From Swiss-Prot:
Protein name in UniProt: Lipid A palmitoyltransferase PagP
EC number(s) stated in the UniProt entry for this protein: 2.3.1.251
InterPro entries in UniProt: LipidA_acyl_PagP, OMP/PagP_b-brl
Nucleotide-binding keyword on record: no
Family: Belongs to the lipid A palmitoyltransferase family.
Gene3D superfamilies assigned: 2.40.160.20
Any GO molecular function: O-palmitoyltransferase activity
Active site: 58, 101, 102
Gene behind this protein: pagP
Amino acid sequence: MNVSKYVAIFFFVFIQLISVGKVFANADEWMTTFRENIAQTWQQPEHYDLYIPAITWHARFAYDKEKTDRYNERPWGGGFGQSRWDEKGNWHGLYAMAFKDSWNKWEPIAGYGWESTWRPLADENFHLGLGFTAGVTARDNWNYIPLPVLLPLASVGYGPATFQMTYIPGTYNNGNVYFAWMRFQF
């Protein structure tokens, strides 16, 4: 191997190491922002929220019919939270909710949610949101062992009433569930 190939390999490795350092620096910055948003939402809420589960739907393409025929798709339960809107108009919320799962067993969930919010109409009360939730849940079929969750969020709302939803990904006959609820801000 000639010297120019060694120099090229050295610079390639060196550039990769520099890039990794920048990625970790950005990850630290992102985590700091995440923690600060949670703390601010906890310490300075603008609203208190009531959560009412509305629907669970098991994607028919991902389940055997005999399974979906037995599943509960009408969850009932409720929850409470507190939330705020940041200077960019984005929503931040802390919540705790319990609902009847697919097997009609209680499933608690608690966490933090964030949505980037758009107000596409002249009426500022109408809003759309897209974001994520990070939290902890527990299920009967897992002996109520706390399980971390990181899921997408989407919403459509008018004023203090918001229809919020997520999708739980999965494999065949497991996961692939659309879950939605109403959130009322006070």
